[in-house]
Amino acid sequence: MQTLSSAPDPAVSIAVTILALLLALTGFGLWTAFGPKAAKLTDPWDDHDD
């Protein structure tokens, strides 16, 4: 049984690191898409005339 003072399993540390990275990237993507600077984004399909 692990106690709080013992070192965590390396697999758990790697899993938590990957999860934190994915959450950070998802948050950044949502902030970019819907945040204050989203008004400056343009749709390339609308800009292209056929």
Curated annotation (Swiss-Prot):
Lipoprotein among keywords: no
Pfam families listed in its UniProt record: PsbN
InterPro entries, per database record: PSII_PsbN
GO biological process, one term: photosynthesis
GO terms under cellular component: plasma membrane-derived thylakoid membrane
Keyword set, alphabetical order: Membrane, Thylakoid, Transmembrane, Transmembrane helix
Main location group: membrane
Places the protein is found: Cellular thylakoid membrane
Family: Belongs to the PsbN family.
Protein name: Protein PsbN
The organism's taxonomic lineage, starting at the top: Bacteria, Bacillati, Cyanobacteriota, Cyanophyceae, Synechococcales
Gene name of this polypeptide: psbN
